[in-house]
Structure formats: C-alpha cells, structure tokens
Design a protein with these regions (language model features):
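Residues that scaffold, gate, or flank divalent-cation-dependent active/transport sites
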Residues: 1-112, 116, 241
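DNA-contacting surface of Y-family translesion DNA polymerases
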Residues: 13, 205-347
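Acidic, metal-coordinating catalytic segment for phosphate/diphosphate chemistry
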Residues: 23, 318, 322-422
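Short acidic, glycine/serine/threonine-rich loops at helix termini
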Residues: 23-25, 49-52, 159-167, 209, ...
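Short Gly/Ser/Thr- and Asp/Glu-enriched loop/turn motifs at secondary-structure junctions
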Residues: 110-114, 154-157, 297-301, 348-352
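Catalytic palm subdomain of template-directed nucleic-acid polymerases
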Residues: 117-138, 211
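Long, highly charged, low-complexity intrinsically disordered interaction regions
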Residues: 131-192, 354
Length: 422
C-alpha cells in the first residue's frame, strides 16, 4: 500500500535560452528573437566555433556550436566576442532570483545556464501549482535581465531534464511536464535516441545497428546486450528508458567521488602538426602542475586525449601511471610528451588536446621526494603561483610560452577556454 505521507517529488530544470547570445543582444538593446547575433571569437577566422546563436538565428536553421563559415552567406549577423566573466556575473544575478523563492539546498547548478530545483516543499507554502511557480521565476528572470527561460518539470530529475530538452521548446509558455505515464505515452517511441540526455550520436548508431531505435526498444532489450554497449551504465540507461531516476538533489550534493582528477582541454586555433601540438601539451602540463601544487595534491597518473582535424578519425587516448604520485612540472611535461609521441598513433593533423591528472591524492599522504632537484623545482613552482596570483597569469612565463605555436598567453586571458571580456 502506498504511504500517504510520502509526497510526490516535483522537480524543475530551468534553462536560459541561448544564454550568451541573449545577454549580448540585451546589452545592445536588441530583441534576441529578432536580432541575428552569434557569440564567437572572430580572431580565430571563419572556422571559429559559435558559442551561442540568438533565437532569431536558430529559427533560421543556424545550429548552436556551428562554425562561422557554416552560417549561410545571405544572412547578415553580428559577431559578439565572448565575455565569460560577464556571463558569469549575469548568471549570478539569476541565481539570486532563485534564492528569493527557494533555499540553496534545493538548487543544483548543472551549468552556467541551467539548474535543477526541487519545488516539492514550496508549492504548498506559496499555494501555487508547479507550473505557476516555475512561470513566476521565469517571468522575474525576463523582467530583471531580459533573458528568456524555458523549463522542464517532472516527478524525478531525469523526467524534468527530458521534458526540457525535447518538449519545452514546443510549448507556447516554454514549460513542459512529464511523469512516468506521460513519458511512456509521449516519448517512449520518440526518435532519434540522441535527443535523450546521456545518449550521444555514436551510441545511437551502435544501438541502431542492434535494432534499437527508441526508449521502448531499450526497455525491452536483453540486459546482456545493453551491458556490452553501455558497460557499467547499462542499468542507469534501463531505468531511464522506463522513466525512472531515484537520485535526488540532496544525494547529488552529498556525493564525494572516491578518486579525484583534474582535467583541461583546448581546441587549437588551427590544425596542428604533432610536433607543434607537443608544445601546447607541455604548456598544459606545466599549468596542471601549478594547479596541483596550489591545491597541495599530487597525481598518481596522467592521461591525454587527442581529437584530429579529420572528423572521421576516432579520438585517441593514452595513459601513464607514476611510480609515486607527483606534482613536479618537469615530470608531468615529460610524461605528456612521451604519451603524445609514443602512444598516440600519428594519423594526421591535430585539432583538440586534453590532459588529465588522475587519482589525485593529498600531498601529505605521499612520500617526500628523495631528490633535491624535485624539492627545488616545487619551491620555484610555489613562488610562481604566488607571483601569478598577485600580478596575473601572464606576469611570468616560461620560454616555451613564447614559441609561435604556444597558446598559453592567450589561454591565460580566458575563462573556460573563452575570452573573459576583461
């Protein structure tokens, strides 16, 4: 028998529509639904990626994350350079709006332009329906910032996210709701599967080769087949196929991973030869060392990821374990170089590289180095950190940062890989 005291959960996930582009339109006194505007770094040339396109351009078929040259030539549009710190400030103002209505314990910030909110305990307090409460917050966001929001609602976090991603954009008020029954009625046979959260294009193609085209197919597929495709995530996917997600915001916030890693990735300004990419990768390893020292931790291993200019070439990855955990710059730089030159197959020009410090442990839990040179280098790196914190990241540079292929100086002016606008 169902416990009458158990209140059914109601979650909302609010998305700020074409956030960066909308902010740039508002700041120019333009209507995002009428102005053709993209946020992109024009200095990267016609191949520069558009971080956001205005709703007006989206309505004309221009896709988000396209490259500048992919926009039809007959469309005249504004190119707004990215200002990441400015967008962060805008997002903080919007977060303050949420806090007027709900506690921070009931908010999970998923990204700069998207957050989950547990509305369950507030509906009775405000004497409002779930849609009414969501609309109240969305209206205040629009009134205060000029940014339009859309909202997905559901009886669990997954259903709220799917309602947002697939249904909300088709609703006049920008709000859509799903429970398990509605999910199966409206979306169980929806195609393509890549429209669903956590299923990418490559996974969709694998599923289609196995005769699986929709969530209903996943729900009825042999578990052994799904385990081969999804690995340890198979049972999460099966739950999602049935509209089930037991995880709560409180559980997400309380979660602490058993191991920690530090990762950074960089899209190169042009296609790089392998010998050129090594320079950027060593810069990234050096910055990673500074980051580890600043956090007083060491890495037990290192991984690099490489994406090639030829999109048909699959991404390559290579890893290395250290005999003892380290945060020494020269060790990380040497390891990164060895992985790229000796472990990554040379199949063509490189467009994107990533580096990750794996299984990070506290510095005081590891053995001290017996080598005086390591101790000296760490002392130098700590001094470098202090100088950079006080005078800026470009106040002191390595010789490698001055090479023509290097990207470190430019990256130091960015937030999340994009220009801060400062």
């Amino acid at each position: 028998m169902k416990n009458e005291n158990l209140q059914e959960k109601i979650y909302a996930v609010i998305d700020l529509k074409s956030f960066y582009a909308s902010v740039e339109c508002v700041e120019r006194g333009l209507d995002p639904f009428k102005a053709d505007l993209v946020v992109a770094d024009a200095s990267r040339g016609s191949g520069g990626v558009c971080l956001a396109v205005s709703p007006a351009l989206r309505a004309k078929g221009v896709k988000n994350r396209c490259r500048l040259f992919e926009i039809p030539r007959d469309i005249k549009f504004i190119i707004a350079p990215p200002r990441m710190q400015f967008y962060i400030d805008y997002a903080a103002r919007i977060y303050e709006i949420y806090l007027k209505y709900v506690s921070k314990e009931d908010i999970y910030v998923y990204s700069i332009d998207e957050c989950f909110i547990d509305l369950t305990s507030y509906l009775k307090f405000y004497a409002l329906g779930a849609k009414e409460m969501a609309k109240m917050m969305m209206d205040e966001i629009l009134k205060t910032t000029g940014v339009t929001a859309t909202c997905g609602m559901g009886t669990n976090l997954y259903l709220a996210k799917i309602a947002l991603d697939i249904l909300a954009k088709h609703q006049d008020d920008g709000i859509a709701y799903l429970d398990e029954e509605l999910y199966k009625k409206q979306l169980w046979t929806h195609q393509p599967l890549s429209d669903f959260w956590r299923i990418g294009k490559q996974t969709r193609l694998k599923l289609e080769k196995c005769g699986i085209f929709c969530m209903k197919d996943i729900a009825n597929a042999p578990k052994s087949l799904l385990e081969k495709i999804f690995g340890v995530d198979a049972y999460i996917t099966i739950d999602h196929a049935n509209g089930i997600e037991p995880t709560t915001i409180a559980e997400i916030k309380a979660y602490k991973p058993s191991t920690k890693s530090y990762f950074s990735s960089e899209i190169l300004p042009r296609d790089y030869e392998r010998c050129e990419a090594v320079i950027v990768l060593k810069e990234m390893a050096d910055r990673l060392a500074l980051r580890l020292i600043n956090k007083e931790v060491k890495a037990s291993g290192l991984t690099i990821n490489v994406r090639f200019a030829d999109k048909l070439e699959p991404q390559q990855r290579a890893s290395m374990r250290f005999k003892t955990p380290t945060n020494v710059s020269s060790v990380l730089m040497s390891a990164a170089e060895e992985l790229l030159l000796n472990k990554i197959k040379n199949v063509g020009l490189i467009r994107q590289i990533g580096i990750s410090a794996n299984d990070v442990v506290k510095e005081n839990l590891t053995e001290f180095s017996l080598f005086e040179d390591d101790a000296k280098e760490k002392a130098v790196l700590k001094s470098l950190n202090l100088i950079k914190e006080k005078f800026g990241k470009n106040s002191i540079l390595r010789a490698i940062d001055l090479l023509p292929e290097a990207t470190g100086q430019d990256r130091n002016k960015k937030i999340g890989g994009h220009k801060s606008g400062e």
